[in-house]
Structure formats: structure tokens, C-alpha cells
């Protein structure tokens, strides 16, 4: 389950991400009622066995039961899970089957559950895989200007729809060649590469997310400020 919200006095609208049908929205009738078994079942980060009916964009949920126990996401890992859910909700078209992304999603959540407060590698890996699914083709290994292989000691500036071009300009869009090589390998073992990867994915995902802020990011920021 990616997200849920009230619908009428007794029901819920539920956004789901499924292996065979992709992302879809279902109406869970009576799920808000006091005696409804669905209320406790429809929780984030719980693998579910589902059944639904309907041919319109809004399906009717007819069955939901846990397929396994909920992944124990806490603190930073919990907010990271909400972020991943929101990414899928915002950028993946409804009812577009993508079994590989579903497996990547499960792998990401499992990694978050294991790492808890060290979440950055799992998030960056998922973001890169998501960009690949979206058809975001960028060559990390060659300069877009000259076609030459990137030099690990040189700097390259990212230009949307073109790629990375050798540049002496130093700003938020500039990356070392060694960082680009690590991006290609999805090797985020070094702290500097992790930081660079975060800069890149924020830029690369922006065309898909638009200007609307991510609610999960705002919630995390508000929580940190409250704790301070």
C-alpha cells in the first residue's frame, strides 16, 4: 500500500503498487468501520495478497490479507519509505505493469528495514533504477561534448537532455569523472559519491515531479525541527 485516505464515512481510497498490475487505486468499502478487518490490514510496508473487481480506473477491493509481516521501518527508515512510496505515486503511470520495478521497490524497503538510520545507499540505488525504468537515458561514461571517455579527475557539468560536458564551472550541476563512473556502476560506497548522487537524482527527477513539493520530505523536515 502506497497511500490511503478517507472516502465517505466508512470507506477508504487506497493507492496500491502491485507486481502484475502496477500502480492502481481501489475503493475499500467499509474499511473505516470499527469492526472492519481491512482497517488493520491496509497498512504501509505490509506485503499483501489482494483481489479486486472493476474495469474503470477506480477498482473495488474485494479481498486483502497479509502475505508476510510488516517491514519494521522506524525513524529515518520510516520517512524514507514514505518518500519511496510518494515517488512511485507521483511518477509511475496507473495500471502500467512493471514487475522489475516492483522487485526493486521490495529490495529497497528490505534494505531500509535492515539499515534503518543509514538509508542513503538504498535510496540512491532505487532512484537510479526508477530513472532507468522511466527511460531516462544518460551516458555517465562519455563526455557529451567530445564523445571521449570521462576522466576520473576532470569535472563535468550536467546539461538536461544532453548529458555531462567537460567544464571548469563549479556548481550544483558539476560532478567529477570518478563520481560519474561510480554512478554507472551504482557504487555508492563512498560518502562523496553518495552526496553527488543525491544532487544528481534531485535534478534528474525534477521534470517528472514538477514543482509540487514532496509531502514526505516536508513531513521529515517538520519532524526534525519539532525534535530540536
From Swiss-Prot:
InterPro entries documented for this protein: ARFGAP/RecO, DNA_rep/recomb_RecO_N, NA-bd_OB-fold, RecO, RecO_C
Family: Belongs to the RecO family.
One Pfam family linked to the record: RecO_C
The UniProt record lists the keyword DNA repair: yes
NCBIfam families found in the cross-reference section: reco (TIGR00613)
UniProt GO cellular component terms: bacterial nucleoid
Function noted in UniProt: Involved in DNA repair and RecF pathway recombination.
Classification via SUPFAM superfamilies: ArfGap/RecO-like zinc finger (SSF57863), Nucleic acid-binding proteins (SSF50249)
Keywords: DNA damage, DNA recombination, DNA repair
Organism superkingdom: Bacteria
BP terms from Gene Ontology: DNA recombination; double-strand break repair
Protein name: DNA repair protein RecO
